A protein has these predicted regions:
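Domain-level signature for soluble enzymes in the chorismate/prephenate branch of the shikimate pathway
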Residues: 1-133
Length: 133
């Protein structure tokens, strides 16, 4: 279930078209691939956006330190959402969407931020979609 463009871009087949209920809907799609071919798929598009999730120690300035590093590396946050970790008092997961112009700088920012986090995962990297509105 994706656009014809996405299917052509990643060498896939459209199973069903126009399944949305809102014609102005913007949906993120996920390509699940064998790790050995994932890099080949990624190279077909310009990677300039990513989704990240991380947790931090519950201490003063921990989030500010992470955000300062992203700023230093010229990483633009387009979304940040904190959700409590169920069963762990005062612990939160931070879901962050970022856009960037330089993939190497993005990877360097992840390397710089990682030691400050309790856990960090890059959920996905892809080309930012363009709005038709």
């Amino acid at each position: 279930i994706c656009s014809q463009y996405a299917a052509e871009l990643y060498g896939m087949k459209v199973l069903e078209e126009s399944i949305e209920t809102n014609k102005h809907n913007f949906t993120r799609f996920l390509v699940v691939a064998d790790p050995w071919i994932a890099d080949d798929l990624r190279k077909q598009s310009k990677v300039n956006k990513a989704n990240i999730v991380f947790s931090l120690p519950h201490s003063e300035g921990s989030l500010s330190q992470v955000l300062s590093i992203f700023s230093f590396y010229k990483i633009n946050l387009t979304k940040i959402q904190s959700l409590p970790i169920i069963g762990r008092e005062w612990q939160y997961l931070f879901y962050v969407d970022v856009i960037f112009n330089d993939y190497l700088r993005f990877r360097q920012s992840i390397d710089a931020v990682s030691p400050l986090t309790k856990e960090l995962k890059v959920l996905g990297e892809y080309e930012e979609g363009k709005s038709n509105i």
